[in-house]
């Protein structure tokens, strides 16, 4: 669920647990562990933490914000709509970064296993 807060002429959108880093970690861990049953939960946790740490270090805020120009007429509905879309855009961007990292990790593992299998086949000769 998304909640909204108005401060002066700005609207902030955040998930119902707040706009903390830890909520995003918990939510994304649940999502990827559920949707990646063949990948170790430890690997998933490492990648989720790494990606979110990189996002936090780069200055990403874990909320969506919409500011109204002082010359424009303020509209709560429009502000909420813009803030919500900015929040969801950030969330989906982070989620796709994690998915890409997981795919790379799985393909590296697959490549290593394939290489080991080839070596084992050569030994059988």
Task: Please report, for each region that a protein language model flagged, where it lies by residue.
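Catalytic phosphate/metal-binding cores of nucleic-acid and nucleotide-processing enzymes, i.e., regions
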Residues: 1-125
